[in-house]
């Protein structure tokens, strides 16, 4: 959101010593995050008013004229210009040397300098509207027309920024920081906060209502839970014309574009007090009645942007006695919009509930400045502010206008929240003892009404904060702390008393697994969204019958909640292959499956959700990455102090290669899988010219040991000897069988590689392992080493018919 400080200063007189930098810091620390501070006058640097004194023909160019121009300095300057509407006495826009403009309104900015045009010296440039950001203020009839300021109150030498009000500072506010503050979606709300921060008075807005004796405008609300208030004013003798320059500037600096005076009034009011308005052309309304109702089945509505929508019975619409005119709180219809022949309007100032607007907006993918504000939950009292300001502006801009009818259907006023909070609670939570007067003063500056009795503060929350923002004592505490300033509270550790030791084996196991994969196995952890692109779900061949579909997905293709982490991992791999050929990634996260997980309230209806762990290695050599990942799983239990996992071939995962896969089991129950990803799955995921080994585990089924007995082993006094052995084994023999035998005969054994080549007989494979040998009584001799190796080979040959591979 953009906030104009010139606009804010209409409502509050800020201390003169407060700089823009200090103001943005204070606002960030106490209310909302200011992302940027923009000086709007910078783009008008060296762009001023000039008055044409002479207009002469160019001696060498029929379309150019040589002008003498008064720019407010001692002597006039000569400027060559091709404008079609130049005349003596005309006030024009001059870009002096050093100014930056869009040449003929196109391309990049060009810096003006003194030059010669067809042999004639030219000091600067007489500008058209599109060249100096003025097309909204002075719409040009053709590209050769220059801006005529003769009707504007200005004199030669005046800076254009001062003339149009662009001598302003605009604050860019992070929208996320005011999501729960509907009162701040207007300049008056920001002014109210600054008034409280700097302890200066806020100028009260005058509430003006139409005369009670005028004709009553008939308003019917069918569902008062969706529309707690609807006001309408019928105004005659208004027509389409440009709004005043000051209003156009305010709207521009607020982040919108001026359109015409009628529409600009509605937008100005919305940006001023945060209350959306809408104007209907009164001549196109059938019957003297407005009906707020749910759409009927089969009804359609052509919106302002000529987008035709098929309404549902859940959509709230504004209707005349014949048909829908607008999608309530979101966008008006084309039929009743303001056009060039408009002579009267019906002005809507209403309140709609947040959920109603949010659901309809998502259904039709419509988000407007009005709907954004309604989605934050506006209080009904703000209708009075919006209506009053709008009527004042119509009278100012259209002195001849006439209010001929007014209606206000107000069934559900916003109720003030009442929150009681004890002095003791505030003292403990703040970590600093404030006096009763300090607390009352702080809250009253924010609009609270406060009574203190028997150590209890009874606070009546203002309506603009009573729409879900402030509802409990912690909210009141937060308001006190932020307004005083968090930096003035000394940080103190929370008092914690343990009556017994805390043992959370699952939490510990989760941390160990993350550390094992990241630090020991060199994986990078990734985090993906719970909703998954259906492209990757289909690629992984996952059955979606048990998947949960979102009613209002972030986008059409992201409509399913994940039931496995593998599709998300495929997407991560697809994106990262643009930058890396080989990498390792893992994720631990929740997945969701249809069905009720545990007893809960009817409102919750929680699905089954469980935590899974998945990891992948990406590389060119399929066999190498598979065995690397297999080693990661085999060492998982050892390094993470949990019950042993076993690997076997029982069920092929849907995304797996036909041959290269293993199931991971614990206590004879399959809890996961390890496999190479099939070529078809990779192709459908947009992954080519690489291989992927992937595993997925049910974290909830992993069982950490409850306790362990640590046995201390002295560091070896004598050096260990490493030796690699390449063994010729039957293809059916697994590494686990070899490891179980060798590990009992050596200090340490590890798998190096498996090889199948031309020199390997059919039905055989070569496995290379590394053993570490040692003797506690001294350094091993060559003879001792050879004797130990021969013993290992004899046992392997006897048990598994394994021989040493001959080179």
Label each residue range with its predicted role:
Residues 2, 445-448, 458, 598-601, ...:
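A carboxyl-terminal module marker
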Residues 1-208, 346, 364-365, 369, ...:
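Phosphate-backbone binding interfaces of nucleic-acid-interacting proteins
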Residues 25, 65, 202-299:
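Glycine/proline-enriched, intrinsically flexible loops and inter-domain linkers
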Residues 118-133, 144-145, 165-167, 318-415, ...:
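Mobile "lid/hinge" segments at catalytic clefts and subdomain interfaces of large enzymes
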Residues 42-45, 209-211, 269, 458-460, ...:
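Beta-rich nucleic-acid/ligand-interaction surfaces
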Residues 419-423, 427-583, 723, 770-774, ...:
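Extended, well-folded interaction surfaces typified by the phenylalanyl-tRNA synthetase beta subunit core
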Residues 48-78, 266-335:
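Conserved mixed alpha/beta core segments that line enzyme active sites in large multi-domain catalysts
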Residues 90, 291-331, 335-338, 495-609, ...:
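Class II aminoacyl-tRNA synthetase-like tRNA-binding/catalytic domains
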């Amino acid at each position: 959101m953009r906030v104009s400080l010139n606009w804010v200063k209409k409502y509050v007189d800020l201390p003169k010593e407060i700089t823009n930098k200090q103001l943005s810091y204070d606002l960030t620390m106490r209310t909302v995050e200011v992302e940027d501070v923009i000086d709007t006058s910078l783009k008008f640097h060296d762009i001023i008013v000039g008055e044409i004194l002479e207009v002469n023909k160019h001696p060498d160019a029929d379309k150019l004229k040589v002008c003498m121009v008064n720019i407010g300095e001692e002597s006039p300057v000569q400027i060559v210009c091709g404008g079609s509407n130049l005349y003596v006495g005309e006030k024009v826009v001059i870009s002096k040397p050093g100014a930056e403009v869009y040449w003929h309104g196109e391309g990049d900015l060009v810096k003006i300098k003194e030059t010669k045009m067809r042999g004639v010296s030219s000091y600067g440039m007489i500008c058209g509207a599109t060249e100096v950001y003025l097309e909204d203020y002075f719409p040009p009839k053709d590209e050769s027309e220059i801006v005529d300021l003769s009707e504007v109150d200005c004199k030669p030498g005046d800076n254009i920024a001062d003339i149009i009000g662009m001598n302003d500072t605009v604050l860019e506010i992070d929208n996320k920081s005011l999501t729960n503050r509907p009162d701040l979606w207007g300049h008056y709300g920001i002014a109210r906060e600054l008034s409280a921060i700097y302890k200066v008075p806020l100028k009260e807005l005058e509430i003006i209502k139409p005369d009670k004796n005028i004709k009553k405008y008939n308003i019917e609300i069918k569902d008062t839970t969706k529309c707690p208030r609807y006001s309408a004013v019928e105004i005659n003798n208004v027509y389409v014309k440009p709004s005043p320059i000051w209003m156009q500037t305010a709207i521009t600096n607020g982040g919108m574009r001026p359109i015409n005076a009628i529409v600009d009034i509605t937008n100005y009011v919305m940006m001023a007090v945060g209350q959306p308005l809408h104007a209907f052309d009164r001549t196109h309304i059938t019957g003297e009645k407005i009906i707020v109702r749910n759409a009927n089945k089969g009804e359609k509505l052509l919106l302002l942007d000529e987008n035709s929508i098929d309404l549902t019975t859940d959509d709230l619409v504004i209707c005349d006695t014949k048909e829908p005119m607008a999608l309530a709180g979101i966008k008006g219809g084309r039929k009743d919009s303001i056009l060039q022949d408009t002579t009267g309007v019906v002005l809507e100032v209403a309140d709609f509930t947040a959920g109603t607007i949010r659901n309809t907006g998502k259904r039709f993918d419509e988000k407007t400045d009005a709907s954004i504000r309604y989605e934050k939950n506006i209080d009904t009292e703000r209708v009075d502010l919006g209506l009053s300001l709008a009527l004042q502006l119509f009278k100012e801009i259209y002195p001849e206008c006439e209010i001929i009818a007014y209606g206000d259907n107000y069934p559900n006023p916003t109720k003030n929240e009442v929150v009681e909070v004890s002095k003791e609670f505030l003292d403990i939570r703040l970590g600093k003892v404030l006096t009763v007067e300090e607390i009352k003063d702080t809250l009253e500056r924010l609009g609270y009404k406060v009574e203190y009795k028997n150590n209890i503060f009874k606070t009546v929350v203002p309506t603009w904060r009573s729409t879900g923002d402030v509802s409990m004592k912690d909210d009141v505490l937060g308001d006190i702390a932020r307004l005083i300033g968090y930096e003035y509270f000394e940080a103190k550790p929370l008092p914690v008393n343990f009556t017994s030791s805390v043992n959370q084996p699952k939490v510990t196991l989760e941390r160990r697994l993350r550390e094992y994969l990241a630090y020991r196995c060199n994986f990078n952890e990734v985090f993906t969204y719970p909703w998954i692109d259906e492209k990757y779900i289909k690629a992984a061949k996952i059955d979606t019958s048990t998947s949960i579909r979102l009613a209002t997905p972030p986008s059409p293709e992201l409509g399913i909640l994940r039931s496995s982490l593998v599709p998300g991992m495929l997407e991560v791999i697809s994106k990262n292959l643009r930058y890396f050929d080989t990498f390792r990634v893992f994720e631990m996260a929740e997945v969701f499956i249809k069905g009720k997980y545990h007893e809960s309230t009817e409102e919750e209806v929680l699905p089954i959700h469980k935590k899974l762990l998945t990891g992948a290695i990406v590389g060119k050599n399929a066999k190498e990455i598979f065995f690397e990942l297999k080693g990661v799983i085999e060492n998982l239990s050892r390094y993470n102090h949990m019950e042993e996992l076993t690997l076997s071939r029982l069920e092929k995962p849907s995304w797996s290669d036909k041959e290269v896969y293993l199931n991971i089991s614990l206590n004879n129950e399959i809890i996961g899988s390890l496999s190479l990803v099939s070529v078809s799955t990779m192709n459908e995921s947009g992954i080519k010219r690489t291989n992927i080994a992937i595993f997925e585990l049910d974290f909830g089924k992993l069982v950490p040991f409850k306790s362990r007995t640590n046995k201390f082993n002295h560091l070896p006094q004598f050096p260990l000897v490493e030796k690699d052995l390449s063994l010729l084994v039957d293809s059916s023999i697994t590494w686990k069988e070899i490891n179980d035998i060798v590990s009992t005969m050596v200090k340490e054994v590890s798998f190096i590689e498996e090889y199948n080549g031309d020199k390997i007989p059919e039905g055989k494979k070569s496995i290379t392992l590394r053993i570490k040998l040692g003797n506690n009584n001294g350094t091993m001799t060559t003879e001792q080493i050879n004797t130990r190796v021969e013993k290992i080979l004899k046992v392997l040959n006897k048990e598994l018919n394994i021989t040493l591979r001959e080179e």
